[in-house]
């Protein structure tokens, strides 16, 4: 006869499929929160600038991870302060083949010339402060994995509402 074993490598399989399993079980987009802070726990320098508080290796890894998610989100404050492009770039600054949907969360108007509106990737502005409503909207659009980059207010709101699946 044939001997059957079940449950082998179950944890490993769950880990590999965690995004899909969580999104489908909860009918909600899986959320990964990228969090960088200075040694004193701040998300910006003392003078308010926030260009980069992480190192080059961390930025390279972040771009590689961006290329593997469905969408990347920041708040309007981050767009106004930093003018990010929110693309997934290789170390030589060329774009990865897959570019995540760029999602801007918040009610403030943004300048039409902001880099998030260039043609490198699609951009969606959700003019709301309701994170659950935003996640519903993204899930309905087929977004199963969201990478939240901040700023600090948006990141804190995700944590406070217990809507982060992975840090």
Functional labels for PLM-detected ranges:
Residues 1-14, 157-159:
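Zn2+-dependent cytidine deaminase-like catalytic core
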């Amino acid at each position: 006869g044939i001997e059957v074993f079940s449950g082998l490598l179950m944890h490993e399989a769950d880990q590999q499929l965690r995004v899909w399993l969580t999104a489908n079980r909860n009918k909600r987009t899986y959320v990964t929160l990228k969090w960088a802070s200075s040694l004193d726990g701040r998300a910006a320098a003392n003078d308010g600038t926030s260009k980069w508080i992480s190192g080059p290796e961390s930025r390279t890894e972040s771009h590689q991870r961006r290329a593997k998610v469905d969408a990347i989100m920041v708040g309007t404050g981050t767009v106004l302060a930093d003018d990010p492009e929110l693309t997934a770039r290789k170390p030589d600054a060329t774009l990865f083949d897959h570019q995540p949907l760029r999602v801007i969360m918040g009610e403030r108007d943004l300048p039409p010339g902001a880099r998030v509106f260039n043609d490198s990737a699609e951009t969606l502005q959700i003019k709301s402060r309701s994170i659950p409503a935003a996640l519903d909207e993204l899930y309905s659009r087929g977004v199963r994995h969201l990478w939240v980059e901040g700023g600090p207010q948006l990141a804190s709101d995700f944590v406070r509402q217990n809507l982060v699946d992975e840090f």
